[in-house]
Amino acid sequence: VMFAHQSTEAWTTLCNSILGARMNITGSWPMDTEMANRSLGLAAAALESSVTVSCRPSERNGFETFKRVKKAIETKVTEEVNALYELGFRGADLLTACFGQAVSEFGKYETVEKADGSEVTVGELLELARTAAFNALLRGFDGDEYTRFYIGWLQMNGIGDTDFDDAAKFARVGM
């Protein structure tokens, strides 16, 4: 599946559709799919990349606790961030590509339950994935929200000029 949205709402819809079709995500990778010098209409937003999502039919195993799935997601997302970062991926697409890895863990089970017995939603899962990816970039740095944003930005983009659309996308997706 080629997916070009960065918003959590769009990802929630995609993941719910995949899981609802008894499929599971096996991987997700950012790909540059747009030309940098293309023309844009008035007030149009520019998309720089898409995420390729691979899926396969899945057999789900009963239920699992959120505590165990959370640990598995944090481990898998950290590994994915490190691998993609080493390959040169940066920007909000690096964080977004980790959504697929989180869903692959979550999708192994019919339900994932919190300690109070309520089910974990895909939206909550994606928030966990975003946090795990961002924490992997910060490698344990503990600071206030603005400092974490700044350090995360530097990790992914370095110092220099940045297109407004890139900064806006990171602000929406990156924290």
For each predicted feature, which ranges?
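S-adenosyl-L-methionine-dependent nucleic acid methyltransferase catalytic domains
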Residues: 1-175
